[in-house]
Amino acid sequence: MAESALTPLRLAQLRRFAARFALSEPEALSWELLHRALIHPSWSAQEGGEDNDRLEFLGDEILRLLAAEFLYRADPELTVGEMTAVRSVLVSDVALAELAEGYDLGEFLVVGRSASGDERGRITRLADGFEAVIGALYLSTGDLGLIRPWLLPHLAHLAESVMADPTRGNHKSALQELTQKLAAGELPEYRLVDPGPPFRYEVWALGRLWGSGEGPSKKLAQQRAARGAYAALRSAFDTALQ
């Protein structure tokens, strides 16, 4: 769809959205590609036409490349394993959805009826849309010039936070390692106490409750519960772990 085929209202919406990124060369942006990046598959399933699936695939690969390059240059002492762990957080649905919310992407995302009331899928929709926008920016110029200036500061800020976290953002894995250090074979038990959404989980280990967490998805609720439980266990057994 060329720019002339976009309705004046939609084009105005796209211009407002693009302005949030303070692009270095806004005139190079393809409005047709940006429009497509903001069409969720639920809309194309309902109304026909193109959606952002392919752009999301491209954007996912670009994000992984940029995150890997950033970590490679940021700290020469990071091992491959450490870089992999940090990158997995940088490009996670939760991290990307938070970035998308910062740019109000949901306001411009076109979704079908089947998805409009699906709160459970909101994080994935936002993350996929964000990746699709990355893909659209790349295809607009054929390079990373429209992406690096605004994305790298986000990666730097998040990477700093993740690397300062001993769990590297994977609280469930860190909690499991911790419980096994304290008692061989001991695994945390996640108990669903509110079927939601939002979902709420409690984490039990060593015969007692250590934390709880709430989130729009079961995965996120468990991670939040594990984060609190990890901190509580570390505090309670600090001497034993030294």
Curated annotation (Swiss-Prot):
Q: Which reaction does it catalyse?
A: Endonucleolytic cleavage to 5'-phosphomonoester
Which part of the chain is the DRBM domain? 170-235
Q: Which InterPro entries match?
A: dsRBD_dom, RNase_III, RNase_III_dom, RNase_III_sf
Enzyme class per UniProt: hydrolase
Keyword Flavoprotein attributed: no
The record's listing under Gene3D superfamilies reads:
3.30.160.20, Ribonuclease III domain (1.10.1520.10)
Task: Check the record and name the SMART domains matching this protein.
Answer: DSRM, RIBOc
Q: Give the chief site where it resides.
A: cytoplasm
Please tell me where Mg(2+) binds in this chain: E56, D128, E131
Q: Where in the cell is it found?
A: Cytoplasm
**Pfam families recorded for this chain?**
dsrm, Ribonucleas_3_3
Q: GO CC terms on record?
A: cytosol
| Residues of the RNase III domain | 14-142
EC number assigned by the record: 3.1.26.3
Catalytic residues? Answer: D60, E131
Q: Which keywords annotate this record? A: Cytoplasm, Endonuclease, Hydrolase, Magnesium, Metal-binding, mRNA processing, Nuclease, RNA-binding, rRNA processing, rRNA-binding, tRNA processing
GO terms (BP aspect): mRNA processing; regulation of gene expression; RNA processing; rRNA processing; tRNA processing
Note the superkingdom of the native organism.
Answer: Bacteria
What is the required cofactor set for this protein?
A: Mg(2+)
CDD domains linked to this entry = DSRM_RNAse_III_family (cd10845), RIBOc (cd00593)
**GO molecular function (one):** metal ion binding
Family note: Belongs to the ribonuclease III family.
Q: What does this protein do?
A: Digests double-stranded RNA. Involved in the processing of primary rRNA transcript to yield the immediate precursors to the large and small rRNAs (23S and 16S). Processes some mRNAs, and tRNAs when they are encoded in the rRNA operon. Processes pre-crRNA and tracrRNA of type II CRISPR loci if present in the organism.
Quaternary structure note: Homodimer.
- NCBIfam families with a match to the protein in the record: RNaseIII
**Protein name, per record:** Ribonuclease 3
Q: Which organism is it from?
A: Gloeobacter violaceus (strain ATCC 29082 / PCC 7421)
- Name of the coding gene: rnc
